[in-house]
Curated annotation (Swiss-Prot):
Its main location: plastid. The keyword Chloroplast applies. The lineage of its organism: Eukaryota, Viridiplantae, Streptophyta, Embryophyta, Tracheophyta. Belongs to the intron maturase 2 family. MatK subfamily. It comes from Quercus gemelliflora (Pasang hiris). This is Maturase K.
């Protein structure tokens, strides 16, 4: 195992990094229940000492606390006999306080790792659209993909054990374990769900931290196996992985691999292996044969069952051929298809034509699931016929139009990377007519009569792209303009899936 030590260059927590005393500080929970920890405040203050002591952490929390001026009131008649306070409110405050305290060492380690790096600020790297340029570059050259649904551990002890390798304060971990079990008994904290949508709306930060700790552990092991199984390290894959997981690998992996993975089989050697993930869904793609993909499938199932004690079955990993199946990822249907092109080549006096058919990644708007989301939100019926939005009929005309425009622009912004715009035009058409019917219902008229009374440019913004009109109702738009805005655009300010697009 000395050979693997070189790959596991990991930071250690100092022995004086104790989190336990912060649990009994009122301002920790006041800060957590207020605006929360500003994730960028720590990144902007790079001048902190790398050997983050307890004094530095306390000063940091105190400074942020004085900026919030939040006072907690514990007066409530409904009290939990264990905590002594309101069961719902103060359990939420405690969970958020635990999360914000345990996050502090991770952010200070992140600051230390970013010192001297070329890129200190990573705002644009947080965009989920940054994944698609990577897919466009790599996936057309690959053959098979595995759609992976990452299982979530239902047992609380697994989550505590995951944190144990990162947080060295035993007192804090014991109290955290006790709190998790008590809180889960009172509020049903841990919920198992096949789609991993287990985050509670009342405690999103706490759930997010527990889930990210588990994912960080799993992906660190997976990345280690990936690097060991290939003679060539792919820079692009490594960079993308670091975007999604900002923490470094941790030291205990050497012991883990010695026990659970004594030998990495030679049949896993593949320099064309790529991996992307968002939330609980990931994609593993390879240029090799289905045999290798099935070997990785078996390996991942054993990893979850043996190391994390999480039950997983083969159905959670589906292997498909990229040229025949579409990937349902980030609310896009992505597929690899041939893009035939004829190139005229001339050499001296001779000219000839070359038929070229390179592979291209198609990203398509999933029209059927999206119409289902619109129907659920009462913009249309199940087959896509627009209907009036009854809940907005009592608003002013300006507010109604503004809200419909806001939804339309957000969807257009998110699906700007679609290679085929026809489906997006249909969604805009549904929203436009739904807006018309809502206004007509308010004015006690029909949609046709209402459209005759308003100006022709009244709903122009529904079909406005950034720079021109690209829609079915503007047939005279220039060919150059249509061609310019029919291409794909990936934005670096999208950090989550649009609500209507999130149909999973």
């Amino acid at each position: 195992m000395e050979e693997f030590q070189g790959y596991l260059e990991l930071d250690r927590f100092r022995q004086h990094d104790f989190l336990y005393p912060l649990i009994f500080r009122e301002y920790s929970y006041a800060l957590a229940h207020g605006h929360g920890l500003n994730r960028y405040m720590l990144l902007e203050n790079i001048g902190y000492d790398n050997k983050s002591s307890l004094l530095i952490v306390k000063r940091l929390i105190t400074t942020m606390y004085h900026q919030n001026y939040l006072i907690i009131s514990a007066n409530d008649s409904k009290q939990n006999p264990f905590f002594g306070y309101n069961k719902n409110l103060h359990s939420k405050i405690l969970s958020e306080g635990f999360a914000i305290i345990v996050e502090i060492p991770f952010y200070l380690r992140l600051i230390s790792s970013l010192e001297g790096a070329e890129i200190v600020r990573f705002y644009n790297l947080r965009s989920i659209h940054s994944i698609f340029p990577f897919l466009e570059e790599k996936f057309p050259h690959l053959n098979y993909s595995a759609d992976i649904l990452i299982p979530y551990p239902a047992h609380l002890e697994i989550l505590v054990q995951t944190l144990r390798y990162r947080v060295k304060d035993a007192s804090y971990l014991h109290l955290l374990r006790f709190f998790l079990h008590e809180y889960s008994n009172c509020n049903s904290l841990i919920i198992t769900n096949k789609s991993i949508s287990i985050f509670s709306k009342s405690n999103p930060r706490f759930f997010l931290f527990l889930y990210n700790s588990y994912i960080c552990e799993y992906e660190s092991i997976f990345l280690f196996l990936r690097n060991q199984s290939s003679h060539l390290r792919l820079t692009s894959s490594g960079v993308l992985f670091e975007r999604l997981c900002l923490y470094r690998k941790i030291e205990h992996f050497a012991e883990v691999f010695a026990n659970d993975f004594p030998v990495i089989p030679c049949f896993l050697k593949d320099p064309f292996m790529h991996y992307v993930r968002y939330q609980g869904k990931s994609i593993l793609a390879s240029k090799d044969t289905p045999l290798l993909m099935n070997k990785w499938k078996s390996y991942l199932v054993n990893l979850w069952q043996c190391h994390f004690d999480v039950w997983s079955h083969a159905a959670s990993i589906r292997i498909n051929q990229l040229s025949k199946h579409s990937l349902d990822f980030l609310s896009y249907f992505s597929s690899v298809r041939r893009n035939p092109a004829v190139v005229r080549n001339q050499m001296l006096e001779n000219s000839f034509l070359l038929n070229n058919a390179p592979n291209k990644l198609d990203t398509i708007v999933p029209i059927i699931p999206l119409i289902g989301s619109l129907a659920k939100a009462k913009f249309c019926n199940a087959v896509g016929h627009p209907i009036s939005k009854l809940t907005r009929a009592d608003l002013s005309d300006f507010e109604i139009i503004n809200r419909f425009l806001h939804i339309c622009r957000n969807l257009s912004h998110y699906y700007s990377g679609s290679s085929k715009k026809k489906n997006m035009y249909r969604i805009k058409y549904i929203l436009r007519l739904s807006c018309v019917k809502t206004l007509a219902r308010k004015h006690k008229s029909t949609a046709r009569a209402f459209l005759k009374r308003v100006d022709s440019e009244f709903f122009q913004e529904f079909f406005t792209e950034e720079g021109g009109f690209i829609s079915l109702i503007f047939p005279r738009a220039s060919f150059a303009l249509r061609r310019l805005y029919s291409g794909r655009v990936w934005y670096l300010d999208i950090i989550f899936i649009n609500g209507l697009s999130n149909h999973e």
